[in-house]
């Protein structure tokens, strides 16, 4: 924060994540979601550390890419050109860059290598966590752009017999790099028509996703931290 690009350019921004709260979200929300919607093999690979890292990199991802652009001789914030499509594109961009950033850290040895096998299953469970804030909201549409794109590439499949989704990690670097290029290109050019086309192609929830969400009513959407200092 803050979200105002003029303030960010002039003064910078600050990110704060509380790891104990993130761990509580992982154990109380993300893991129960995964049990309902992911394959048994993927549930076994879940990692609180991968969850924390990808959320951290999501927030960093918001600050990567263009903020102010010039289109047709007019300079303004990216969101002014993408209008109502901006938030969904931006959320999808931040998620996509979170995976690329984390994979980069893995490749550079900055993160333990054994975390890699946990990354895609944890990310996939995280998509279901996020989408529950609202299918029609920016985060929900942004999630479905990623989900449907990755499913098209074969990185996510659905087992009709078990009604569970399966993560396939082969070439995930290539898949996320391709999606990041599409999203960043839209933002760099302020291309409203391309944003609209991408959302129309990938932004709608599938029947399988909708059905999976009906099995999550017993899982909290979020947690409510209680701070002893204000009791």
Show the residue positions of the predicted features.
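Solvent-exposed, acidic/flexible segments
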Residues: 46-50, 87-91, 117, 121
């Amino acid at each position: 924060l803050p979200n105002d690009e003029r303030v960010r350019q002039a003064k910078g921004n600050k990110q704060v994540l509380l790891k104990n709260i993130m761990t509580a979200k992982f154990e109380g929300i993300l893991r129960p979601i995964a049990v309902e919607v992911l394959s048994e093999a993927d549930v076994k690979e879940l990692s609180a550390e991968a969850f924390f890292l990808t959320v951290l990199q999501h927030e960093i991802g918001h600050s990567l890419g263009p903020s102010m652009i010039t289109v047709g001789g007019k300079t303004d914030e990216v969101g002014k050109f993408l209008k109502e499509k901006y938030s969904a594109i931006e959320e999808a961009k931040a998620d996509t860059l979170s995976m690329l950033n984390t994979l980069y850290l893995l490749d550079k040895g900055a993160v333990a290598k054994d975390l890699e096998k946990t990354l895609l299953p944890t990310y996939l469970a995280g998509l279901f966590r996020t989408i529950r804030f609202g299918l029609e909201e920016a985060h929900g549409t942004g999630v479905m752009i990623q989900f449907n794109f990755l499913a098209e590439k074969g990185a996510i499949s659905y087992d009709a017999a078990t009604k569970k989704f399966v993560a396939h990690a082969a070439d995930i670097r290539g898949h996320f790099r391709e999606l990041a290029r599409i999203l960043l290109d839209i933002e760099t050019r302020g291309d409203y028509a391309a944003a609209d086309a991408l959302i129309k192609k990938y932004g709608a929830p599938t029947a399988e996703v909708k059905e999976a969400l009906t099995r999550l009513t017993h899982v909290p959407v979020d947690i409510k931290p209680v701070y002893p200092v204000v009791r």
